[in-house]
Amino acid sequence: MTCHLTPKQLEVLHCLSQGMQNKQIASEMGVSLSTVKIHLNRIYMRLHVSNRLQALLWMNDNDLV
């Protein structure tokens, strides 16, 4: 279940699962650091989590990693 995440949000989660930091994610996706932070905040809201570790655990629980 992806909780209606956008393709870009799923891409951010994939980058998180590879251990990338926000600056690396921005570079990988060709977006600004603030855009990555916005994506992360929206991901956290949709997944009902409060940080990247919880998001990664959610991904693991939902077989996305």
Predicted regions and their residues:
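A general structural signal for well-ordered secondary-structure junctions
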Residues: 19-22, 65
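Recognition helix of helix-turn-helix DNA-binding domains
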Residues: 21-54
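Short, basic, alpha-helical segments at the C-terminal edge of helix-turn-helix-like DNA-binding modules
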Residues: 52-63
